Design a protein with these regions (language model features):
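Nucleic-acid endonuclease domains
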Residues: 2-73, 77-81, 87-223
Length: 223
């Protein structure tokens, strides 16, 4: 099967982000973390907003421009390249990360579609909606910043577009009690995607292979 998103190797990631990305990211994050170390040492949990990850990524890439805050699907722009930044976390024994939003719809029909188990309408609204936004970007990339809850160290994974012609098939959709699991966007060994009824949005989780395999995981921050 041809997936929409495929994982990038470390050479590809370094080529996208630049040779000095890791060093600059470490420096930028230290500036954010330094005032918080007192509280972290006392056991307070570290909480960083979505935009802070975007700011640091933007500041760590030469000639990059931040364009997040819900203005478009991308958060960081480098010329015609658009980067969608997802900040997530995991525990030591996790098999997947926390979730991040990919696409949200506030249409009232969403709950009706779930009640009727109407997989095609849910797909058309969320998956096709997300694909439409991806197609609007000349060169789209999705990056995940995975923070370890125990150590606060971070690694980065990235995905590039391989195919935007993914079509609805009933067997790509599977209902659980509160969500519809969507297959086909990426290999399930790397990414899990679901549409949640209560949140009315398509969400992504990164799977353990993406941070365990050194071919795909780039260490970017050491606490």
């Amino acid at each position: 099967m041809t997936y929409c998103l495929i994982p990038m190797t470390l050479p590809e990631i370094n080529n996208l982000l630049g040779a000095n990305f890791v060093n600059t990211f470490q420096t930028e994050m230290d500036l954010i973390i330094a005032p918080l170390r007192k509280y972290i040492a006392k056991g307070y949990p570290l909480a960083l907003g979505k935009e802070q990850w975007e700011y640091v990524v933007s500041e760590s890439i030469p000639n990059a421009e931040w364009c997040g805050a819900g203005k478009s699907i991308i958060d960081v722009k480098i010329g015609s390249i658009g980067i969608d930044v997802k900040g997530v976390s995991k525990e030591e024994t996790s098999t997947s990360t926390t979730e991040a939003s990919m696409f949200q719809s506030f249409k009232e029909e969403t709950k009706l579609y779930f009640n009727k188990k109407d997989t095609e309408s849910i797909w058309n609204l969320f998956v096709d909606g997300w694909l439409s936004k991806v197609k609007s970007v000349d060169e789209y990339y999705l990056i995940g910043i995975v923070r370890e809850k125990e150590t606060l160290n971070c690694s980065l994974c990235a995905f590039k577009v391989a195919d935007t012609n993914l079509l609805y098939e009933d067997d790509l959709c599977k209902f659980t009690k509160k969500s519809m699991k969507v297959s086909g966007l990426a290999d399930s060994a790397f990414i899990e995607t679901r549409v949640y009824s209560s949140k009315t949005r398509l969400e992504i989780k990164f799977k353990s292979k993406v941070w365990q395999d050194p071919n795909y995981a780039l260490p970017i921050y050491k606490f």
